[in-house]
């Protein structure tokens, strides 16, 4: 099966580097499926899960808060603002953060409070979507 080199990097660390058969991510125009030999492409990433399909048929799922996806025919690079392996996401902490953001939104005192609360809600929604992908994979 054909493969391509994939690198998923955050500001803090390299999350994944190796051969993959496919990468699935949410770009600016919607969900993208990248296979070896894909036409060159650069797009902004939307917050949410990135699915990396490995040669052995297994799948890695990584949460990204946003960033850039660069595709070359045999190399795909994810430069993420924040990237966390989905297995390392703490669902209880995310639910607590969502609750806090909802309270902040309900008690907003300024447009800045509202913007911060909406950003936090969007981030927690993307993290919970990533957790759901992991749970679906396990079934």
UniProtKB/Swiss-Prot annotation:
Cell location: Cell inner membrane
Residues of the signal peptide: none
CDD domains: F1-ATPase_delta
Matching Gene3D superfamilies: ATP synthase delta/epsilon subunit, C-terminal domain, F0F1 ATP synthase delta/epsilon subunit, N-terminal
Keyword Ribonucleoprotein: no
InterPro entries (alphabetical): ATP_F1_dsu/esu_C_sf, ATP_synth_F1_dsu/esu, ATP_synth_F1_dsu/esu_N, ATPsynth_dsu/esu_N
Topology with respect to the bilayer: Peripheral membrane protein
Domain of life: Bacteria
Keywords for the protein's UniProt record, in alphabetical order: ATP synthesis, Cell inner membrane, Cell membrane, CF(1), Hydrogen ion transport, Ion transport, Membrane, Transport
Chief place where the protein resides: membrane
GO cellular component terms attached to this protein's record: plasma membrane; proton-transporting ATP synthase complex
UniProt KW Cell wall biogenesis/degradation keyword: no
GO molecular function: ATP binding; proton-transporting ATP synthase activity, rotational mechanism
Entry's family note: Belongs to the ATPase epsilon chain family.
Subunit note: F-type ATPases have 2 components, CF(1) - the catalytic core - and CF(0) - the membrane proton channel. CF(1) has five subunits: alpha(3), beta(3), gamma(1), delta(1), epsilon(1). CF(0) has three main subunits: a, b and c.
Function per UniProt: Produces ATP from ADP in the presence of a proton gradient across the membrane.
Protein's UniProt name: ATP synthase epsilon chain
